[in-house]
């Protein structure tokens, strides 16, 4: 059996990636989230496939087809809620995964980090298009507001928006293309995941100490397969609790009202995982400025490796940087809260302050702190 595992052309790849992979012996539970993201992707593809069998991408029947799935399809309600709450689990794992990369300096593995950011953008695009498909009020108006942001692009903006819509407003053409793209993107994401892992296995995993562990590695199986399996069980427990006991906890009640272009909801907001970016968008009173800030709020991660002059890779032994990291986390939580609030004082000023703090921390304060820490350590 060992010979087949190590010599068979296909099994050899799986063996070198999942069984005999040399792994640092000291990686903590925060390194579990990569495998959990893989599990989330598989759950989303399987549940999504079953939903696509019963869904119709037509403005007249989309809403009722989702109702039909929940009422008439065997366990359709469960598949629908697993898919909707699976997206929330996906983003929860994504944010922790990126946060761990920032805290432990994994961004020094440049190729892996950049492919990861492409993955983050792809997953966000997929989730946005998926939110449009049930064709409720928030689906329709969310699609209208977010796609309309592209009209802020000088000269080509209006044409670009109408090209994406397939008409002069969000219509049947928009819904059909969003469904097609929402269906194909997870498979493109799967290909990017393979590239992400390919780059990661070229350099090997980082570890909490940020030091080379080449002289001291252990095989991935059975140590980390067991550890990952425990994480997977906890993820499934949380997902099942959400889907079976609190299925609509993270959703919006407005989405249970069929889309009506003549009636605007009192407060348009995206799903919780986009609220931080939405708050940054709203905090700038200029349309183009808001769109630029929105894109930069994620794209800034790409320049993080060039903004960190620290001599120690991880924040484990750098208390000042640790303090600032947790301020950044608190700031993002504040932005998430603000994104769900109406556009009125004091929420406007809190959002603007939090947005300024977010960019200041990323571009100036954290790099400057790294330099101070280097001086203190006489490096």
Swiss-Prot record:
InterPro entries: Cyt_b/b6_C, Cyt_b/b6_C_sf, Cyt_b/b6_N, Cytb/b6-like_sf, Cytochrome_b, Cytochrome_b_C_euk/bac, Cytochrome_b_N_euk/bac, Di-haem_cyt_TM. The chain crosses the membrane at residues 33-53, 77-98, 113-133, 178-198, 226-246, 288-308, 320-340, 347-367. GO terms for biological process: mitochondrial electron transport, ubiquinol to cytochrome c. One of its GO terms (cellular component) is respiratory chain complex III. Binds 2 heme b groups non-covalently. SUPFAM superfamilies: a domain/subunit of cytochrome bc1 complex (Ubiquinol-cytochrome c reductase), Transmembrane di-heme cytochromes. It holds the Pfam family Cytochrome_B. Its cofactor is heme b. It is a multi-pass membrane protein. It is found in: Mitochondrion inner membrane. Heme b b562 binds at residues 83, 182. Keywords: Electron transport, Heme, Iron, Membrane, Metal-binding, Mitochondrion, Mitochondrion inner membrane, Respiratory chain, Transmembrane, Transmembrane helix, Transport, Ubiquinone. Its main location: mitochondrion. One of its GO terms (molecular function) is ubiquinol-cytochrome-c reductase activity. Heme b b566 binds at residues 97, 196. A ubiquinone binds at residue 201. Component of the ubiquinol-cytochrome c reductase complex (complex III or cytochrome b-c1 complex) that is part of the mitochondrial respiratory chain. The b-c1 complex mediates electron transfer from ubiquinol to cytochrome c. Contributes to the generation of a proton gradient across the mitochondrial membrane that is then used for ATP synthesis. The cytochrome bc1 complex contains 11 subunits: 3 respiratory subunits (MT-CYB, CYC1 and UQCRFS1), 2 core proteins (UQCRC1 and UQCRC2) and 6 low-molecular weight proteins (UQCRH/QCR6, UQCRB/QCR7, UQCRQ/QCR8, UQCR10/QCR9, UQCR11/QCR10 and a cleavage product of UQCRFS1). This cytochrome bc1 complex then forms a dimer. Belongs to the cytochrome b family. Heme 1 (or BL or b562) is low-potential and absorbs at about 562 nm, and heme 2 (or BH or b566) is high-potential and absorbs at about 566 nm. This is Cytochrome b. It comes from Lepilemur septentrionalis (Northern sportive lemur).
